[in-house]
From Swiss-Prot:
Residues 220-415 are annotated as: SBD. Pathway: Protein modification; protein ubiquitination. It comes from Caenorhabditis briggsae. It holds the Pfam family Sina_TRAF. The lineage of its organism: Eukaryota, Metazoa, Ecdysozoa, Nematoda, Chromadorea. Belongs to the SINA (Seven in absentia) family. This is E3 ubiquitin-protein ligase siah-1. The RING-type zinc finger domain is essential for ubiquitin ligase activity. Residues 74-88 have a biased composition (Polar residues). E3 ubiquitin-protein ligase that mediates ubiquitination and subsequent proteasomal degradation of target proteins. E3 ubiquitin ligases accept ubiquitin from an E2 ubiquitin-conjugating enzyme in the form of a thioester and then directly transfers the ubiquitin to targeted substrates. It probably triggers the ubiquitin-mediated degradation of different substrates. GO terms for biological process: proteasome-mediated ubiquitin-dependent protein catabolic process; protein ubiquitination. Keywords: Metal-binding, Transferase, Ubl conjugation pathway, Zinc, Zinc-finger.
Length: 434
């Protein structure tokens, strides 16, 4: 396309063309077909006579730029010359005629002083085609939707953008992911709810302690899927912030503490390493095989707090049997209590598949307790504190003891789904006297 110089009309012409290009209207040139484009001239008679003598015709991306003077219509030269068009300050873009029986007319875009009025639809115009194809005209909303980015749920993948957004929720103190509610300092710095009570000032800017709630960030957190706290240990799951803490309490990838009671062992490790740790470090613990065994506690009359521990292996699982004697202080008097409980070296889900029974039997008397084993995550301390186990005082212990030794019959059974009891459901202690 060549530009012709002359008069102010050419400048307006160039201004309109550049305005259309800046408005991102797409015009594709078809070099094989299309109508001839009228020559653009100025409104002066001298410029019109000079340009009417030229026989060269131009194409402008299959677009006809039309306009009229006062009556807004084209006038053709009666001498057979190329029709002339006067370009005013306003013009209208129209689609070209397609060399086929049917023609397509797209909605127009009104251009005023080099700007596009967005109140009308715009057309994505393609070159002419030999087939009778009708091209649909998308609206502005449809065109905006076609180029809008698809925003994934944050945390569902491992791409860089998700990691960058998740980094906003990292606590600067413990480096864990913060969960709602979010509190920020006047400078906008955040800290998690676990670390905030321990701080005297903002750890980032040393300003006042974060105390302003950030409601906007909480709305964003509702769209984020946070990885499990133990993802570095192998957990592949991501959770909404409401479900994250509940999962982490029972996550099988969380580190396991040493289950041996009464010891100051601070060991932590994977579930598969617990038994190796007990055999190497706590060598005094004895392991018996079978579903029915006798747990013999010796020297139960020793003063002070004492505990007895042994292992029972059955159903390809390992169970820890614990008997503890503790001082129970009462305002009236101080008494000693015995607590017996069974713990599975496994998760809570696995523990729900078993039931254990403890029984004391001697001198024509019988005392029994039946319940679901505690998991290694739950431990035995809480069960003993709540007396959720076989509990009896020293007077009852003497009824079943012989020469200071107390034998407890332990039976472990596997149950199916129908027989499975509620986690908090246990049998009461049965005491029988023959």
């Amino acid at each position: 396309m060549s530009n012709r110089k002359g008069g102010g009309g050419a400048g307006d012409y160039q201004e309109v063309i550049e305005s259309l290009r800046r408005s991102q209207l797409i015009f594709e040139e078809d070099e094989n077909a299309g109508p001839e484009i009228p020559t653009v001239v100025t409104s002066s008679s001298s410029a019109s006579s000079q340009r009417s003598s030229a026989s060269q015709h131009h194409r402008l991306n299959n677009m006809v730029v039309g306009g009229g003077g006062r009556d807004n219509e084209m006038s053709n030269n009666q001498n057979g010359n190329t029709p002339s068009v006067t370009i005013p300050s306003q013009c209208q873009v129209m689609t070209p005629r397609i060399s086929s029986p049917s023609s397509v007319m797209a909605p127009s875009v009104t251009v005023t002083s080099g700007t596009v009025q967005q109140g009308k639809t715009f057309a994505r115009i393609q070159g002419s085609s030999p087939s009778n194809t009708t091209h649909s005209t998308p609206t502005v909303a449809q065109a905006m939707q076609s180029v809008a980015p698809h925003i994934p749920i944050v945390g569902a993948g491992a791409d860089d953008s998700s990691a960058e957004i998740l980094s906003v929720f990292e606590c600067p103190v413990c480096l864990e992911y913060m969960l709602p509610p979010y509190m920020q300092c006047p400078s906008g710095h955040l800290v998690c709810s676990n670390c905030r009570p321990k701080l005297q000032c903002c750890p980032t800017c040393r300003g006042p302690t974060p105390s302003v709630r950030n409601l906007g960030l909480e709305k964003i957190a509702n769209t984020v899927r946070f990885p499990c706290k133990f993802s570095n240990s192998g957990c592949p799951l991501n959770f909404h912030h409401i479900d994250k803490m509940d999962h982490e309490e029972l996550c099988e990838y969380r580190p396991y503490s040493c289950p041996c009671p009464g010891a100051s062992c601070k060991w932590q490790g994977a579930l598969a390493d617990v038994m190796d740790h007990l055999k190497k470090v706590h060598k005094s613990i004895t392991t018996l095989q079978g579903e029915d065994i006798v747990f013999l506690a010796t020297d139960i009359n020793l003063p002070g707090a004492v505990d007895w521990v042994m292992m029972q292996s059955c159903f390809d699982y390992n169970f820890m049997l614990v008997l503890e004697k503790q001082e129970k202080y009462d305002p009236a008097q101080s008494t000693q209590m015995f607590y017996a409980v069974v713990q599975l070296i496994g998760s809570k889900k696995e523990a729900d598949n078993f039931v254990y029974r403890l029984e004391l039997s001697a001198n024509r008397r019988r005392m029994s307790w039946e319940a679901t084993p505690r998991s290694i995550h739950e431990g035995v301390a809480f069960a003993i504190q709540q007396s959720d186990c076989l509990a009896f005082d020293t007077s009852a212990a003497q009824l079943f003891a012989e020469n200071g030794n107390l034998g407890i019959n332990v039976t472990i059974s596997r149950i199916d789904g129908q027989q499975r009891r509620h986690p908090n459901e246990s049998d009461a202690v049965d005491v029988e006297y023959d």
